[in-house]
């Protein structure tokens, strides 16, 4: 299933994997998965984390390695984001609930994910998605950006 991914997608997933793999040992544990999910405003139980790992843990060793992660991501992409998932993702970024994602909100979420971005990088991300040029990302722009991936 991971065969359908482009080199660019694989490179993006490698970057995402390393955000999860906090200690850099090449595997994602339930603890590491929990850390990332909590930084995104989720609050999974230990059992839910274990279920998520088990769902993709092909060799049954209790952790996710990169090939297993790729397979999970390929599956998720095939199921493309539902409206509900997009709304939830938008809410993670739109911290004050005003229906717009500001540069500060974007920087906050990216920092929580361990991505230290310069102001220029954050501004560039906003500019890329900001179709109407108001300096913020609204829901329609967010959906367009997510679907373009």
Curated annotation (Swiss-Prot):
Pfam families: EF-hand_7 (PF13499). Ca(2+) 4 binds at residues 130, 132, 134, 136, 141. Ca(2+) 1 binds at residues 21, 23, 25, 27, 32. InterPro entries: CALM/Myosin/TropC-like, EF-hand-dom_pair, EF_Hand_1_Ca_BS, EF_hand_dom. Residues 8-43, 44-79, 81-116, 117-149 form the EF-hand domain. Keywords: Acetylation, Calcium, Metal-binding, Methylation, Repeat. Belongs to the calmodulin family. This is Calmodulin.
């Amino acid at each position: 299933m991971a065969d359908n991914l482009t080199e660019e997608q694989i490179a993006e997933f490698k970057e995402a994997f390393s955000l999860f793999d906090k200690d850099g040992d090449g595997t994602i544990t339930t603890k590491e998965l929990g850390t990332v999910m909590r930084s995104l405003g989720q609050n999974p139980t230990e059992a839910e984390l274990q279920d998520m790992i088990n769902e993709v843990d092909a060799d049954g060793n209790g952790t996710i390695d990169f090939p297993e992660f790729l397979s999970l991501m390929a599956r998720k992409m095939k199921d493309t984001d539902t409206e509900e998932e997009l709304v939830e993702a938008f809410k993670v970024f739109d911290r004050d609930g005003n229906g717009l994602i500001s540069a500060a909100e974007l920087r906050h979420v990216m920092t929580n994910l361990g991505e230290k971005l310069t102001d220029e990088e954050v501004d560039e991300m906003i500019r890329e998605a900001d179709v109407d040029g108001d300096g913020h990302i609204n829901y329609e722009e967010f959906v367009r950006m997510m679907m373009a991936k």
